[in-house]
């Protein structure tokens, strides 16, 4: 099975622009891999985002186990990439993260799937780490809203 993932961050965008970007790419399901699916940006917290996506025919799923733990988020904010990678690698070894990874790979084989987190630039986000480590054979398209 050939896997293809889209990635998208909502940093600096609006819900309408975000929806336009994922719709234009043909995304059919969006998987939120934030540990905490909350946002100060209007419309990007879990319930509001799910509703907005479902209104345009895109399914929403939150996989908390693939999120970055608090100490990893702190390392990322402070630019400590090696610490972020070490912390996130340990997170992905947890049984619930292993199960979530299997679920995400299955979903991506069924329909065009986007990974969501906050950061606009994928290189600075754990979604790129997940893809590099857990789906290295996948093709990846980074979306920018």
Positions of PLM-derived features:
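Residues lining hydrophobic/aromatic ligand-binding pockets adjacent to catalytic sites
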Residues: 1-145
């Amino acid at each position: 099975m050939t896997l293809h993932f889209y990635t998208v961050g909502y940093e600096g965008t609006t819900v309408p622009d975000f929806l336009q970007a994922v719709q234009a790419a043909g995304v059919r399901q969006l998987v939120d891999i934030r540990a905490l699916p909350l946002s100060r940006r209007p419309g990007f917290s879990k319930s509001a985002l799910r509703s907005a996506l479902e209104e345009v025919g895109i399914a929403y799923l939150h996989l908390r186990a693939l999120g970055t733990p608090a100490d990893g988020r702190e390392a990322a904010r402070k630019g400590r990439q090696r610490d972020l990678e070490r912390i996130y690698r340990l997170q992905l070894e947890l049984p619930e993260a292993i199960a979530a990874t299997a679920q995400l790979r299955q979903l991506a084989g069924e329909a065009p799937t986007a990974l969501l987190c906050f950061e606009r630039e994928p290189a600075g986000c754990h979604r790129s780490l997940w893809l590099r480590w857990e789906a290295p054979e996948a093709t990846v398209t980074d979306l920018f809203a």
